[in-house]
Amino acid sequence: MIQTIVDYNYSEKIKDLKLSQKLNCHIKINTGMNRIGERYDNMDRLIKIYENPRLNILGTFSHLCVADSDKKEDIEFTEKQIENFNKCIKQLKENGQDVGKVHLQSSYGAINYNTETYDYVRIGIIMYGVNSDNTAYQKNKLDLKPVLSLKARVTSVKEINKDDSVSYGRTYIADSNRKIASISIGYADGFPRCLSNKNMLVKVNGNYSKVIGRICMDQCVIDVTDVKEIKTGDVVYIIDCDDINLSSEKFAMNADTITNEFLSRLGNRLPRIRS
């Protein structure tokens, strides 16, 4: 485990801990995102962090906050962040500080600002072969191949009559006799409740089906009236890495979020199968 030192005050508190050895850590530099990190031009405070005898400093890093944008002002801001970071690293080294491994770029930093070279690159979302959303800027186009699919199974199949309701709140009322199926995924697994009654599509046995009614904690219901062959245990695709209509980006867009949030919220109850 390697700790992040988020600022000078944090580093000072380390001195009060009863540690049996120096704390392995990386130092976070705030170059403009203003989330965590000691500000890049607070050189006196930064030097005190690096001279803290309780720290074993293995690296130094910052984070770009608009590297995925093609807006002129955002590109200029990112370039300024890079300039601030490089200047800070240079000054620390000139003062004799060992900054360790240096890293700045995450996925879009690596794609759009790859002329900058550091020791590490923190690849995140593009490891899944997807973009954060369909509007994300890529200066250097990558032919990304999605690798993640999300599946559930049919747990029940039944017929309902016209005017029957489905799930909590009776938000779906059948306008005709329908065939429906319950499937084994809900908002506790990362299928957000906000997608209830949004004409969300899933795929079962090669057929698209709509999610109907409110999404429950552990289950949801789909309309399978037009699916001729369906039975308990059949696989249902919520995300299909080989189907653009069931992409992670489209799922996230429908939930008014980004794929980073959606994928990070997939619950631990979901088995991970690597192939």
Where do the language-model regions lie?
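Active-site-proximal beta-alpha core segment in soluble small-molecule metabolic enzymes
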Residues: 1-103
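Active-site anion/phosphate-binding pocket segments in diverse small-molecule metabolic enzymes
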Residues: 7-12, 23, 73-275
